Amino acid sequence: MSRVRPTKFAHVVYRTRRFKEMLRWYEAVFGAEVQYQNPVLAFLTYDDEHHRFAFANLSLIQPDGTEADRHGVIGVDHVAYTYASLRDLSDNYAYLKEKGITPYWCAHHGITVSMYYADPDGNQMEFQVDSYRSNEDANAFMYGPHFSANPIGVEYDPEDWLARLRGGTPEADLLLRQIHEPVSPVRGSLEE
């Protein structure tokens, strides 16, 4: 298996207890616009990408948390990198697995299919592929009821998807999230 590299930096996710203040700051500094917002999550962009920044409101996620809590620490939650195709993302999964590196969470967010990893220091990163061919379609999905009903996504089994892709299943059959699938719990640093 050969190494597969991401094609671009995608976004950064911040954990904050100053949710509204952070949104105003990023709107002012970057000219960012809110793509989607609910009381717990917000997604902003400053270009044609579906989102460049995401914010998790710790005041609601961990209302009793302190700065010393592992799950309630403000700051960077993860950085994300985009791969050219679902096949590349899955091949990279197989390559890393051969080296003993496996994701702690695989989620189909609707706008992206993602695998989350943690480095030896616990820094989290998301490797993703866009589910839509155009940013316009991804943005339309974010404004729609399907995303509003489930902005976290659904978990999937990377082994199953790898086997399906290698067995000839078209990427398009896996990229569009089905509305009936259950909402995934949040994994990683915000997990209880």
Where are these regions (language model features)?
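Vicinal oxygen chelate
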Residues: 7, 15-21, 73-74, 79-124, ...
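Short, P/G- and charge-enriched loop/turn segments at secondary-structure junctions
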Residues: 1, 66-67, 103
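Short N-terminal helix-initiation segments at or just after the protein's N-terminus
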Residues: 15-27, 56-67, 162-163
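A detector for short, charged/polar N-terminal pre-domain segments
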Residues: 1-2, 164
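Conserved short beta-strand elements that form part of the metal-binding/catalytic scaffold
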Residues: 33-73, 118, 124-132
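N-terminal "first-domain core" detector
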Residues: 5-47
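Histidine-centered active-site/metal-ligand motif
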Residues: 11, 50-53, 63, 78, ...
